[in-house]
Amino acid sequence: MGLSDGEWQLVLNVWGKVEGDIGGHGQEVLIRLFKGHPETLEKFDKFKHLKAEDEMRASEDLKKHGTTVLTALGGILKKKGQHAAELAPLAQSHATKHKIPVKYLEFISEAIIQVLQSKHPADFGADTQGAMSKALELFRNDIAAKYKELGFQG
């Protein structure tokens, strides 16, 4: 399940492009998540009133949260799988406070892939997409294992 050094390099290269506009990418990821899986919106008290895409695009809070999400994910990706210290508090909050099911992490992973395909087609070919998919799957599997340790059946 682990990624090769070359795969990690592909992931981090495209992630550098994300960091060039992390707020824009984060906003787009959350909009795709909420439009594709409206049930996920119910987990966000701050955003559940946003029903239309233009309302979502106008929300500074949504953009700010997208930045938070992708900044945290970027920190985890940069650890190249050695992310236990970064993952523990994230799993704790998402299991005990936010109660985010692993399925929703799959949904946001799909949204991340879609946004990267849309914004960076020249830099997100099959090899890079495959590497990113593996990295996100590793992240989800490790979160799921932490959830289990915490007794959360997410």
From Swiss-Prot:
Instruction: Write down the top EC class of this protein.
Output: oxidoreductase
A Pfam family that the UniProt record links to this protein: Globin
Please state the Enzyme Commission number of this protein: 1.7.-.-, 1.11.1.-
Q: Name one process (GO BP) from the record.
A: removal of superoxide radicals
What species does this protein belong to? Answer: Hystrix cristata
Kindly list the positions at which Phosphothreonine occurs in this protein: T68
Main subcellular localisation: cytoplasm
Q: Annotated Gene Ontology MF terms?
A: heme binding; metal ion binding; nitrite reductase activity; oxygen binding; oxygen carrier activity; peroxidase activity
Tell me which UniProt keywords the record has, alphabetically.
Answer: Cytoplasm, Heme, Iron, Metal-binding, Muscle protein, Oxidoreductase, Oxygen transport, Phosphoprotein, Transport
The entry marks the following residues as binding nitrite, namely: H65
Q: Which ranges carry the Globin domain?
A: 2-148
- What are the leading ranks of the lineage? Eukaryota, Metazoa, Chordata, Craniata, Vertebrata
Q: Which family does it belong to?
A: Belongs to the globin family.
SUPFAM superfamilies associated with the record = Globin-like
Report the protein name in the record.
Myoglobin
Residues at which heme b binds = H94
Oligomeric state and partners?
Monomer.
Which residues are modified to Phosphoserine?
Answer: S4
| Location of this chain's protein in the cell | Cytoplasm, Sarcoplasm
Gene3D superfamilies referenced in this protein's UniProt entry, alphabetically: 6.10.140.2100, 6.10.140.2110
Q: What does this protein do?
A: Monomeric heme protein which primary function is to store oxygen and facilitate its diffusion within muscle tissues. Reversibly binds oxygen through a pentacoordinated heme iron and enables its timely and efficient release as needed during periods of heightened demand. Depending on the oxidative conditions of tissues and cells, and in addition to its ability to bind oxygen, it also has a nitrite reductase activity whereby it regulates the production of bioactive nitric oxide.
Could you say which residues bind O2 here?
A: H65
Q: Name one GO cellular component term.
A: extracellular exosome
Q: Give the matching CDD domains.
A: Mb
Instruction: Please give the catalytic activity noted in the UniProt record.
Output: Fe(III)-heme b-[protein] + nitric oxide + H2O = Fe(II)-heme b-[protein] + nitrite + 2 H(+); H2O2 + AH2 = A + 2 H2O
Recorded hits in PROSITE patterns, A to Z, give: GLOBIN (PS01033)
